[in-house]
């Protein structure tokens, strides 16, 4: 039995394609959320995920698209990256994201696991956090293993007989390594992998969107290095390890316009 575990593509098609090529065939694919958001190719990445027949859960950026949908906001000239992403997605894409369950059950290395984007009520997690942070939510989990995405770094912690695993990000690493991360499970053994991809292709695609120059310059450095002073913070007790990336940060240039929405 071969099971592919993938997470946090963030509309980075070059990285997604590289991971699928590196992994080869799998009996089952499990996707842990955020297929869209802060990336240049949301349509193609969502199409590719839909074609894989994966068991999938939504991420917070996927949920942002559905929140915009509920507000019936489709701006002819999107003001930020979230609005631009929404303007690209078709009804079929949004229906697909809407259909995803918040959590699914699966086996991870032969042990029953709950699969979701991020543990409910947990802070943004970092591999250097103490056991007490993990035991707080693991003790409430319905199954002995919890497998998630969202933190964009590999985390594999066992506390009091329970295990938390965060699958590393494909499209937006934050660990100082720009390669796309994923995991592959074969006959109950897990292997975490990192694969190089054409970062400059994604950089060119991102630069063409019309983002404000100051944000774009910082974002491309982040993409090329897998590190940013705020978005990749190290763990310091008592301090947040993440500054949230919200759409308001990633503004579009007023003159940039927008390709027509897909129907």
Q: Whereabouts are the PLM-identified features?
A:
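Beta-strand-turn-beta hairpins that frame and shape the catalytic cleft
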Residues: 1-4, 105-114, 159-163
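Core catalytic region of metal-dependent phosphoesterases/phosphodiesterases
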Residues: 2-98
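Histidine-centered catalytic micro-motifs
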Residues: 8-9, 115-121, 146-154
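Active-site-proximal segments of metal-dependent phosphoesterases and phosphodiesterases across multiple
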Residues: 73-80, 110-141, 173
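Conserved hydrophobic/aromatic beta-strand scaffold that supports enzyme active sites
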Residues: 103-105, 115, 156, 180-184
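Anionic-ligand binding region
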Residues: 130-165, 170, 180-182
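Acidic, His/Gly-rich catalytic cores of divalent-metal-dependent hydrolytic chemistry
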Residues: 158-263
């Amino acid at each position: 039995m071969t099971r592919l575990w993938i997470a946090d593509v963030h509309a980075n098609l070059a990285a997604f394609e590289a991971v699928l090529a590196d992994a080869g065939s799998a009996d089952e694919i499990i996707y842990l959320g955020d297929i869209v958001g802060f990336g240049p190719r949301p349509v193609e990445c969502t199409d590719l995920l839909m074609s894989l027949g994966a068991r999938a859960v939504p991420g917070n950026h996927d949920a942002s698209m559905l929140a915009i949908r509920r507000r019936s906001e489709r701006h002819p000239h999107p003001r930020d990256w979230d609005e631009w992403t929404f303007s690209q997605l078709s009804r079929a894409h949004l229906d697909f994201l809407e259909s995803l369950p918040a959590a699914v059950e699966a086996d991870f290395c032969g042990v029953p696991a709950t699969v979701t984007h991020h543990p409910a009520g947990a802070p943004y997690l970092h591999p250097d956090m103490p056991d007490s942070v993990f035991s707080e939510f693991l003790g409430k989990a319905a199954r002995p293993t919890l497998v998630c995405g969202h933190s964009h770094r590999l985390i594999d912690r066992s506390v009091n007989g329970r295990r938390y695993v965060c699958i590393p990000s494909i499209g937006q690493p934050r660990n100082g390594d720009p390669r796309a991360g994923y995991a592959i499970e074969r006959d109950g053994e897990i292997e975490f992998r990192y694969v190089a991809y054409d970062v400059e292709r994604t950089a060119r695609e991102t630069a063409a969107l019309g983002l404000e120059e100051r944000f774009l310059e910082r974002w491309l450095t982040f993409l090329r290095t897998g590190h940013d002073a705020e978005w990749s913070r190290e763990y310091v007790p008592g301090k947040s390890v993440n500054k949230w990336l919200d759409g308001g940060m990633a503004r579009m240039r007023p003159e940039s316009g927008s390709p027509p929405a897909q129907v």
